[in-house]
């Protein structure tokens, strides 16, 4: 098989990233201290990121940076500053949730490759077209999809020059990524801001079935589903786990690397998955991939199940087990973990992410060119001015001036450590422009002979007036029994359509056709036939206006020329998100996210003729 399958690994800190690299990851994804959906991970500084990129590239491994949270209005300046820094790194892509960030990157930082985060809940073909339109080159498909759905969506993605990722190992959430508000509502920590409190792992009152953790799903594992994922032409197999340590990352990535290599080389799978059970797990399920959604997907233990698994395997072999044997099994598991950990530490011990030191030596002699010699552990080169130095009594170059002009180097992976002025004579003149040109050329060479991209100032968005002088009333109904309200008010009445149409949507087509003032309200999740039926509603009713929480339906409405409004579950939280929807897909208005407060909403600037 000639097609490359990317193994994409998590990196919550520098050690975990090193572990992923030596274990055979083709790419790693990691976050900085801000703007990423794993605040509980250690994360990286910008200097560490640059060192990680250099190290990863030496091993043929790519680095993707997670900027996968929604952004608040006051954060525009901070994210713009960061993007200005990122364009002068060699980062291979950024992983994005915020719709406004797509707009900023597409307009002002087009050299950055943008990947759509799992937080964008991508599960139907319209959403892939939507994301391609706003600038995504890769999408992460929702974990809830089955294999035929993944295959179909990957085909659609490839038709639009978009790559697909699928999570193949790690934690599963009880809700769709990007559509879980339990943490936000219960304790005020939004998962869309990287602060999920994991309510699905909490203990609740014991259920009738005797479970204390009724929302706790087993971990995802597609270890034996590799042939089907290859057949689906998925581009990237993604491992979850940026909160996990280096030992976990190394073990999982190493196990998956061997599985992929075995299948690519021989067409055969490795049957032994025991190492996956030796690191943190909640037992495993592939129920979503198989489309087999049952109670067996759940486990009444949110903590590490590796010890329970080892004891169960020993019990199966012997039909019974004693306390002494349990202790022996425990010791064996700890020893196995130690072996894997020591193997990992031996491999990463000498991996270095520190910046390469640079020493500058200057030479200034009358009648000769001004010379700068650049020395690094990996390369040395010398540059000269075009003009010859002249003796003068005034305006001569000085050590102080040279130190100021050469106070640093504009390179993400180099640091200036020393200046040597011992060969610089006093009382000599050289045009300052030539000194600046030499500095720029040094930066160019140290930057891999790539021009340093200049700082971009993102202009403030204009403030357009409200469409209506005063706020208007509207209401949302979800039941036929509430249709009488339609006759007693002049307010806009939205009719909430279900996530699942069970068989067909004829019932809802009849309701909407009989009540033309009703405005269809589409849900956030529409998979497979439910998406097809939702599209059929648009095609048969051709409503004048809709509200949609699903970007796939938004794209279809845009194609059909139907006026559409973004629902609150599209998670719009800033002005640039509204600009994206208006400029790219002719959106007419938006319900701002329910997760931000009145003070945060007040500063959002609407596009022209755009209703909030």
Specify the residue positions occupied by each region the protein language model found.
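Active-site PLP-lysine loop of aminotransferase-like
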Residues: 123
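Glycine-rich, highly charged phosphate/nucleotide-binding loops
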Residues: 44-49
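Surface-exposed amphipathic alpha-helical tracts and adjacent flexible/coil segments at the periphery
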Residues: 1-22, 27-34, 38, 53, ...
């Amino acid at each position: 098989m000639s097609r490359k399958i990317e193994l994409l690994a998590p990196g919550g800190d520098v050690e975990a990233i090193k572990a992923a690299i030596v274990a055979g990851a083709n790419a790693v994804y990691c976050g900085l201290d801000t703007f990423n959906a794993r605040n509980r991970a250690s994360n990286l500084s910008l200097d560490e990121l640059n060192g990680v990129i250099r190290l990863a590239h030496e091993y043929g491994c790519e680095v993707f940076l997670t900027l996968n949270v929604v952004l608040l209005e006051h954060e525009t300046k901070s994210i713009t500053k960061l993007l200005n820094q990122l364009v002068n790194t060699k980062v291979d892509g950024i992983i994005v949730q915020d719709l406004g960030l797509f707009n900023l990157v597409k307009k002002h930082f087009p050299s950055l490759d943008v990947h759509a985060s799992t937080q964008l809940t991508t599960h139907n073909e319209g959403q892939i077209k939507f994301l391609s339109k706003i600038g995504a080159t890769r999408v992460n498909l929702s974990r809830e999809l089955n294999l035929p759905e993944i295959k179909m969506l990957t085909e659609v993605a490839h038709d639009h020059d978009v790559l697909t990722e699928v999570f193949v190992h790690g934690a599963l959430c009880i809700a769709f990524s990007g559509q879980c508000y339990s943490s936000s509502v219960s304790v005020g920590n939004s998962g869309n801001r990287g602060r999920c409190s994991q309510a699905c792992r909490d203990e609740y009152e014991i259920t009738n079935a005797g479970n204390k953790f009724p929302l706790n799903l087993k971990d995802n594992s597609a270890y034996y589903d590799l042939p089907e994922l290859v057949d689906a032409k998925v581009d990237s197999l993604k491992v979850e786990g940026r909160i996990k340590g280096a030992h976990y990352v190394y073990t999982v990535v190493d196990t998956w690397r061997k599985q992929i290599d075995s299948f690519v080389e021989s067409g055969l799978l490795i049957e032994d998955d025991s190492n996956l059970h030796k690191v943190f797990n909640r037992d495993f399920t592939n129920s979503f991939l198989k489309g087999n959604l049952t109670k067996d997907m759940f486990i009444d233990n949110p903590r590490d199940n590796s010890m329970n698994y080892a004891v169960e395997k020993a019990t199966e072999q012997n039909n019974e087990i004693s306390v002494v044997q349990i202790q022996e099994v425990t010791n064996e598991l700890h020893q196995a973990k130690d072996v894997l950990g020591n193997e990992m530490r031996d491999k990463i011990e000498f991996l270095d992410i520190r910046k390469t030191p640079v020493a500058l030596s200057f030479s200034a002699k009358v009648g000769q060119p001004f010379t700068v010699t650049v020395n690094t552990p990996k390369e040395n080169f010398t540059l000269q001015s075009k003009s010859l130095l002249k003796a003068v009594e005034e305006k001569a170059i000085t050590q102080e001036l040279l130190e100021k002009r050469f106070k640093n180097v504009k390179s993400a992976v180099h640091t200036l450590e020393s200046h040597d002025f011992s060969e610089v004579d006093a009382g000599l003149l050289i045009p300052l422009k030539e000194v600046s040109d030499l500095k720029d050329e040094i930066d160019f060479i140290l930057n891999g002979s790539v021009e340093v991209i200049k700082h971009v100032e993102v202009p403030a968005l204009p403030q357009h007036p409200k469409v209506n002088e005063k706020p208007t009333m509207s209401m949302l109904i979800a039941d036929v029994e509430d249709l009488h309200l339609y006759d007693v008010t002049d307010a806009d009445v939205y009719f909430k359509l279900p996530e699942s149409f069970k068989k067909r949507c004829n019932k809802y087509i009849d309701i909407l056709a009989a009540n033309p003032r009703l405005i269809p309200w589409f849900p956030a999740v529409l998979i497979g036939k439910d998406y097809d039926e939702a599209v059929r509603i648009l095609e048969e009713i051709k409503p004048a206006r809709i509200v949609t929480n699903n970007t796939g339906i938004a794209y279809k409405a845009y194609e059909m020329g139907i006026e559409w409004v973004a629902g609150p579950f599209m998670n719009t939280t800033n002005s640039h998100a509204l600009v994206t929807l208006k400029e790219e897909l002719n959106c007419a208005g938006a319900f701002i996210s329910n997760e931000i407060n009145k003070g945060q909403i007040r500063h959002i600037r609407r596009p022209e003729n755009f209703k909030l």
